[in-house]
């Protein structure tokens, strides 16, 4: 409490210092940003945006222009002060800054001190914005950026399933709802630009960031990503999809360092890896793009004129600004090692088309080499004006020069994490769950069960069962808690059984290591609990220690002692249900052969326990469909949809086929398709056709069905995929 009071006192005192010289800039219907007493064109809300951009550029110095081309990381990471201070007039951002990332969102040095109650966070951003508007010469507002791939990356914001789970819903309308919730909460808290969605396609399940992807198919990822972009920007925010481009297929799935060396041919790059971004820009009008760390064919993407100008701007008509992933610019000099000096590094990225550099280091580390590169003639003033103009255009489009203080500093709690938003979170958790196996209709379980054993390292886990770039400190309901609350009259007991990983992981994946005394005791406890129970529900999978950025794997089997736990509990002879809570595909061949019922829940978010309980006991009929292929062996990888002829052919000495295919998912009911109609039997290159059919629920339960349409060419000028999805529709 003392820290918060001190911070607020500092805020007020700073505000009083500034107020005397700036109180007259706020006019009726306009703001005198440059404090000259005249309504300049860039200050006129009625003037065309291009005219406002040109007028502002004409008034800017070299120092002011270059300051727009860098990010200032907030929350004590680079910006060490919680509130503006008099010392800021000596910092490089005295001439402005392009954007401030993750300020007062609950991460970093200040934690929840500034982020919650929510009004503190809004007031903090308003005071920082006020400093830039009132204390810099031209008063150019800051773009406050934040992450948001599974809900807004803010303390106690509404949490949704990880993007891999959102992909499993196959529900475009739901993604639009998630986008609106994220946007509404961002707006209420004063953020203006959300770094979402991730449009990387997950073609290699070993890769650590598959958890953050909508799936392996470019059509599905593009359609869902388009809805996220449209939903965010419909509420007045900028959406910045990432990571452009060809980022998600590093050789061997190895994630770390620069994520270099994607072995992707040009045609595959365009049809698979660029297609979701093309949709996001051409069809949804994304105002931002984040450039990636990796190279393509030896050229770093963040320094590539081909990617950032020829493809983005010339081919696709991109009108926003490109921000680098953190340290992607510096990698040209330090890791890719293609620019001998920092000045050449700055010149290459700016000439290529990059607008804003981001890194966890002070902005002057880029701005000063940038200025030297300009003075040395490595960057023309024309190019500089292009890059800065693109940044300013987005700021005008966001309305920052008309209202630089968005957000509700009085009652943001009426918006953030409200009841309606929690309903959308619950809906998303339910729709993301995929039923993988249901032998003899073992599921749904009877609600009259007396003794239920909930076993496994993910049964009572909270902290590690999310992924990055989303809400923190949300009240997550565990699977054990969810089942216990769902059946208050049953005896529901819990045993951990083992940890997600053992102490020798990942080396233990290379050879058998005997169980130590503690590990054996944990498994024994779980076995004894199963023996005295009517059923054992095992909750296994992964967590942030096994799947996330920089956490790639060389195996897709269950980690640690989980397989031994599963087999030991199964050996008791009691009925077993397996619930997988994980962020990637797993080679659960043994479970698929022996365990009668398997459910995959991904990382469902704050209503994890409630949603899984509803599915297991029949209050909700699971309708999720896999957005990634489950291989039988890691040796089959890469093994992802869409396939080319021959890539899934049979062999004599290798494992063939998939464990679960892309688009797969069972239901508690059955559906019948009939009366397929095609409007035209033959169409030309630029013509359309309409297909329709009748889908009938032939079972005894209500349920959802994802109608999937796949097409292929009989003959084509080049080798193409056997079939590709072209439409999807969720019906209930």
Question: Where would I find each of the regions flagged by the language model?
Answer:
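Glycoside hydrolase catalytic-domain context in secreted enzymes
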Residues: 16-723, 727
């Amino acid at each position: 409490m003392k820290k918060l009071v001190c911070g607020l006192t500092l805020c007020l005192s700073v505000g009083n210092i500034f107020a005397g010289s700036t109180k007259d800039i706020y006019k009726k219907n306009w703001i005198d940003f440059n404090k000259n007493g005249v309504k300049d064109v860039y200050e006129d809300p009625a003037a065309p945006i291009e005219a406002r951009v040109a007028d502002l550029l004409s008034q800017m110095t070299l120092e002011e222009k270059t300051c727009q081309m860098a990010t200032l990381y907030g929350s004590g990471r680079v910006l060490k002060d919680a509130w503006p201070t008099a010392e800021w007039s000596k910092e490089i951002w005295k001439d402005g800054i392009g954007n401030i990332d993750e300020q007062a969102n609950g991460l970093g040095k200040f934690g929840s001190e500034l982020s919650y109650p929510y009004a503190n966070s809004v007031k903090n951003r308003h005071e920082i914005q006020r400093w830039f508007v009132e204390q810099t010469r031209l008063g150019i507002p800051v773009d406050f950026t934040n992450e948001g791939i599974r809900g807004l990356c803010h303390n106690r914001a509404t949490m949704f399933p990880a993007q891999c789970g959102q992909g499993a819903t196959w529900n475009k309308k739901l993604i639009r709802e998630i986008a609106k919730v994220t946007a509404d909460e961002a707006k209420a808290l004063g953020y203006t630009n959300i770094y979402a969605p991730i449009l990387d396609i997950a073609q290699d399940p070993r890769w650590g960031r598959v958890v953050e992807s909508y799936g392996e198919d470019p059509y599905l990822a593009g359609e869902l990503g388009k809805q996220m972009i449209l939903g965010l920007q419909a509420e007045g925010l900028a959406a910045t999809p990432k990571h452009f481009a060809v980022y998600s297929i590093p050789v061997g799935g190895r994630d770390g360092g620069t994520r270099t060396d994607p072995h992707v041919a040009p045609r595959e790059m365009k049809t698979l890896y660029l297609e979701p971004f093309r949709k996001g820009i051409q069809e949804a009008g994304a105002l931002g793009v984040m450039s990636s760390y990796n190279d393509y064919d030896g050229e770093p993407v963040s320094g590539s004129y081909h990617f950032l100008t020829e493809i983005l701007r010339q081919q696709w008509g991109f009108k926003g600004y490109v921000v680098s992933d953190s340290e992607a610019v510096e990698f040209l000099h330090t890791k890719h090692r293609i620019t001998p000096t920092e000045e050449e590094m700055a010149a290459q990225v700016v000439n290529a088309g990059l607008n804003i550099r981001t890194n966890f280091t002070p902005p002057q580390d880029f701005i000063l080499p940038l200025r030297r590169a300009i003075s040395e003639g490595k960057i023309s003033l024309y190019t500089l004006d292009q890059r800065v103009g693109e940044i300013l255009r987005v700021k005008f489009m966001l309305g920052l020069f008309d209202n630089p203080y968005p957000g509700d500093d009085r009652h943001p709690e009426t918006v953030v994490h409200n009841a309606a938003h929690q309903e959308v979170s619950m809906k998303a958790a339910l729709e993301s769950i995929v039923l993988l196996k249901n032998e003899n209709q073992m599921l749904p379980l009877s609600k009259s069960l007396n003794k239920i054993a909930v076993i496994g390292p993910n049964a009572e886990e909270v902290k590690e069962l999310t992924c990055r770039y989303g809400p923190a400190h949300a009240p997550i309901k565990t699977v054990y808690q969810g089942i216990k609350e769902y059946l208050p009259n049953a005896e529901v007991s819990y045993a951990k059984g083992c940890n997600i990983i053992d102490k020798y992981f990942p080396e233990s994946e290379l050879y058998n290591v005997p169980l130590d005394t503690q590990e054996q005791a944990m498994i024994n406890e779980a076995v004894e609990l199963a023996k005295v129970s009517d059923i054992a529900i095992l909750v296994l999978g992964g967590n942030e220690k096994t799947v996330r950025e920089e956490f790639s794997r060389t195996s897709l089997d269950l980690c640690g002692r989980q397989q031994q736990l599963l087999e030991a509990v199964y050996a008791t002879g009691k009925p077993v249900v397996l619930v997988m809570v994980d962020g990637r595909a797993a080679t659960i061949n043994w479970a698929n052969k022996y365990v009668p019922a398997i459910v995959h829940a991904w990382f469902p978010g704050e209503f994890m326990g409630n949603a899984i309980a509803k599915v297991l006991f029949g209050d909700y009929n699971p309708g999720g469909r896999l957005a990634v292929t489950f291989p039988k062996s890691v040796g089959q990888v890469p093994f992802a949809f869409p396939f080319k002829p021959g890539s899934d052919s049979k062999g004599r000495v290798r494992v063939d086929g998939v464990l679960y295919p892309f688009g797969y998912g069972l239901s508690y009911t059955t559906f019948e398709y009939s009366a397929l109609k095609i409007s035209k039997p033959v169409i030309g290159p630029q013509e359309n056709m309409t297909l329709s059919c009748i889908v009938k629920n032939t079972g005894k339960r209500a349920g959802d069905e994802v109608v999937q349409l796949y097409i292929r060419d009989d003959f084509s000028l080049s080798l193409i995929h056997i079939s590709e999805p072209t439409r999807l529709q969720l019906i209930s």
